[in-house]
Regions:
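Beta1/beta-strand and adjacent pyrophosphate-binding region of the FAD-binding site
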Residues: 1-12
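Flavin (FAD/FMN) cofactor-binding core of flavoprotein oxidoreductases
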Residues: 119-122, 142, 290-292, 296-360, ...
Length: 395
């Protein structure tokens, strides 16, 4: 049986970029993904690159590295990620004071430009002028997240990386070390295993009696077929409820996140939309805090709510065909990401729970791959310290 240097669990954008970067270091890597046809946060991503949103030295450094990486990624991977610079329009509700909202953005690396209603509608003609009191304009990047992930996977395979489609059901232990994984169909051995399973990372690790403070919301959004009109910007609300919802997760106990999942779901809606280069539109999104990762949310109710709220800002989108989808979106309340060795167990790592996933994950994957081979990296070491300080010992 082959013993790999690394097993990476999960082939969304985080697992794909990490597997690629590990293989770039000459390591023998196995990537295991449960779904041959992906159905995850990568597939349903807006694709936005909020490199402007750094608030301290760490996030500003990574924001700069992240946008620079994406500008050159198509060339590096020899495949089109559909990267482009695209203005972000943050709409301000009619009842809100634009100057007050602007002040809320003063802490970011790039200060937004405050637009009048008229100027906002000139920049994005599809906006409803009667629904807003103004807007904030920011430079933003955009990619096709699934095509970017596929580009990473193809480059990974060119580096002799191996991809297997199977479901990981347990970790293989030998003494105080993890030495591989058990899937539904086989076992695989490795010196190191890293979990990049997004919102499912927590439940996967729980099966191995490892507690991790990696949480998730259930996102619901609408994807449309290509349309014959153009949305020229990324449109999102200036006051986003999702971050408030994630902050409320701090009030939950560990028991709330464990079966039998008695906590009633709490949901918010941030109305926004983006159009891809092929003409498809993604609009949403509802975020629901429901500890059961298999929770069943009503797609018909969600679609009606999304259409009502989005059409208030972008009336032309109200009746266009589209299908409501859902996925888990991972987050944590400790750091910009959960990266590093888990508990007191050798050979098991996590790479999940990102803020600004598309900006931070690719550059942190590059840093992590070099760090595990002995290159000093203060950012990865800082993130490891966060995990070490909060991680309970193995049950």
């Amino acid at each position: 049986m082959t013993t790999y240097n690394w097993i990476v669990i999960g082939a969304g954008i985080t697992g794909a970029c990490l597997a690629y970067e590990l293989s770039q270091q000459g390591l023998n890597v196995l990537l295991i993904e449960k779904d041959k046809t992906p159905n995850n946060a990568t597939v349903y991503s807006y694709g936005g690159l909020a490199y402007w949103s750094g608030t301290d030295k760490l996030t500003r450094t990574l924001g700069g590295e992240g946008i620079e990486l994406h500008r050159n990624l198509s060339q590096e991977l020899d495949a089109d990620t559909e990267f482009r610079d695209l203005d972000l329009v943050l709409t301000i509700d009619r009842q809100d004071d634009p100057e007050v909202i602007l002040q809320n953005y003063a802490r970011f690396a790039i200060t937004p430009e405050l637009l009048s209603v008229n100027d906002a509608c000139i920049l994005e003609p599809l906006l409803n002028p009667n629904a807003i009191s103004g807007a904030l304009k920011l430079p933003h990047g955009h990619i096709h997240t699934q095509k970017t992930t596929e580009a990473y996977l193809q480059a990974f395979e060119r580096n002799n990386g191996v991809i297997i489609y199977d479901r990981v059901i347990d970790l293989l232990h030998q003494g105080d070390s993890v030495v591989g994984v058990q899937t539904e169909n086989d076992t695989y051995q490795a010196d190191n295993t890293v979990v990049c399973a997004g919102g499912l990372s927590r439940s996967l690790l729980q099966q191995a009696n490892i507690e991790v403070e990696n949480y998730y919301t259930h996102a619901q959004l609408i994807l449309t077929p290509p349309v014959d009109f153009e949305l020229g910007t990324v449109v999102m609300p200036a006051v986003q409820q999702r971050f408030i919802l994630e902050a409320k997760a701090r009030e939950l106990t560990t028991e709330d996140w464990d079966p039998p999942y008695d906590l009633a779901p709490k949901a918010i809606l941030d109305p926004g939309a983006v159009q891809f280069l092929d003409g498809r539109i993604c609009m949403g999104q509802i975020s629901a805090l429901a500890p059961n990762p298999q929770a069943k949310l009503n797609p018909f109710k969600a679609e009606a709510e999304i259409r009502e709220r989005v059409s208030n800002v972008l009336p032309l989108l109200e009746d266009i065909p589209g299908t409501c989808h859902s996925c888990l979106v991972a987050f944590n309340n400790k750091a910009i990401a959960l990266i590093g060795n888990l508990a007191d167990i050798k050979g098991i790592y996590i790479f999940s729970g990102f803020t600004s996933t598309l900006v931070f994950a690719p550059v942190l994957a590059k840093r992590f791959a070099r760090w595990v081979l002995g290159k000093e990296d203060k950012i990865i070491e800082e993130l490891q310290l966060v995990i070490s300080a909060t991680q309970p010992h193995q049950n």
